[in-house]
Design a protein with these regions (language model features):
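Single conserved hydrophobic/aromatic residue that forms the stacking wall/gate
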Residues: 199-211
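ER/Golgi luminal nucleotide-sugar-dependent glycosyltransferases, focusing on the catalytic module
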Residues: 1-198, 202
């Protein structure tokens, strides 16, 4: 029931770290699951219990709603140590279970998190590497809404309608309404924010989400 007020810096990474530091590991290790979620997504479009029931049935250490698929053609941010963008759970929603919360690897990760100065740091020091790092340590992960690697790298933004209709993804990116026309044409197959709006506010979907 605590609300933490902080200076708006360090992006979502520092918000998560601030909350972790204030609660402390002694309290956090008692949690069954810890959710790290930011405000770059909107929803829910569908009842969240669908997603939680589905993921609760899986033997995992951490999970997310969506993932960014591997991009091997370099590092556009210049901050990712492996030189490319690994497949990763997107940081707008990551749930971490007790098996991982109480691990020294997870605790050391946050205790030693470096300063986040800009968006490139947020991606390179956390989002792009988090899944790869902990997966290689043996922690099991998955995502709820997965369009498949062959579809595109960023389906929650570039295939929003398909994610909602075919995968019942409960969230969509706020940035869907702030895309330039160049991006709409080249990345989202001509899908417009208006089309997404009609899906989001359509009567069957709206009633299902609030029921």
């Amino acid at each position: 029931n605590n609300v933490i007020e902080r200076e708006n810096k360090g992006f979502d990474v520092w918000a998560y770290k601030t909350a972790i530091d204030q609660y402390g590991w002694e309290k956090l290790v008692k949690f069954d699951e810890m959710i790290m979620m930011n405000f770059t997504i909107m929803g829910p479009v569908y009842p969240l219990n669908e997603m939680f029931e589905c993921m609760d049935a899986k033997d995992l250490d951490f999970w997310g709603v969506t993932k960014f698929h591997k991009y091997e053609n370099g590092d556009p941010f210049g901050t990712i140590k492996v030189g490319y963008i690994p497949e990763h759970i997107q940081s707008h929603f990551i749930a971490v279970r007790n098996s991982m919360i109480k691990s020294k690897q997870f605790q050391n990760y946050w205790n030693k998190m470096g300063e986040i100065n800009d968006y490139r740091d947020a991606v390179g020091k956390h989002e792009a590497m988090f899944t790869k790092r902990f997966s290689e340590m043996g922690f099991k992960w998955d995502v709820y809404a997965d369009m498949g690697e062959e579809y595109n790298n960023h389906p929650i933004l570039c295939a929003t309608r398909e994610m909602i209709e075919k995968k019942r993804c409960p969230f969509f990116k706020r940035r869907s309404f702030m895309q330039s026309y160049d991006n709409i044409i080249s990345d989202t197959f001509g899908q417009s924010a208006l089309e997404l709006s009609l899906i989001h506010i359509s009567e069957p979907t709206r009633q299902e989400a609030i029921s």
